[in-house]
UniProtKB/Swiss-Prot annotation:
Pfam families: Ribosomal_L32p (PF01783)
Gene: rpl32
InterPro entries linked: Ribosomal_bL32, Ribosomal_bL32_plant/cyanobact, Ribosomal_zn-bd
Broad class of where this protein is predominantly found: plastid
A GO BP annotation: translation
Organism of this sequence: Jasminum nudiflorum
Keywords from the named record: Chloroplast, Plastid, Ribonucleoprotein, Ribosomal protein
PANTHER family in UniProt: 50S RIBOSOMAL PROTEIN L32, CHLOROPLASTIC, LARGE RIBOSOMAL SUBUNIT PROTEIN BL32C
GO CC aspect terms: chloroplast; large ribosomal subunit
GO molecular function: structural constituent of ribosome
Subcellular localization(s) per the UniProt record: Plastid, Chloroplast
Protein name per its UniProtKB record: Large ribosomal subunit protein bL32c
Superkingdom, taxonomy of origin: Eukaryota
Keyword Disulfide bond (UniProt): no
Similarity remark: Belongs to the bacterial ribosomal protein bL32 family.
């Protein structure tokens, strides 16, 4: 069975962890951006039923309200 000869350094662990987290953050940002463009009607590449646009708009409205409340504290 293969066993590593030396212990992985803390800095290398941190680099790998941050890289992994960064990928997730980028994906979440893209998803939020896509949802926002769909809700405003600026999307040119997706056809979305009207009732789901209402849901997206409600989500964006709630998100904006939460951001406003968070900035006051």
């Amino acid at each position: 069975m293969a066993v590593p000869k030396k212990r992985t350094s803390a800095s290398k662990k941190r680099i790998r962890k941050n890289s992994w987290k960064g990928k997730g953050y980028g994906t979440a940002l893209k998803a939020f951006s896509l949802g926002k463009s769909l809700s405003t009607g600026n999307s040119k590449s997706f056809f979305v039923p009207k009732n789901s646009l209402k849901v997206f708009k409600r989500i964006i409205k709630n998100w904006n309200n939460l951001n406003r409340l968070g900035s006051k504290n």
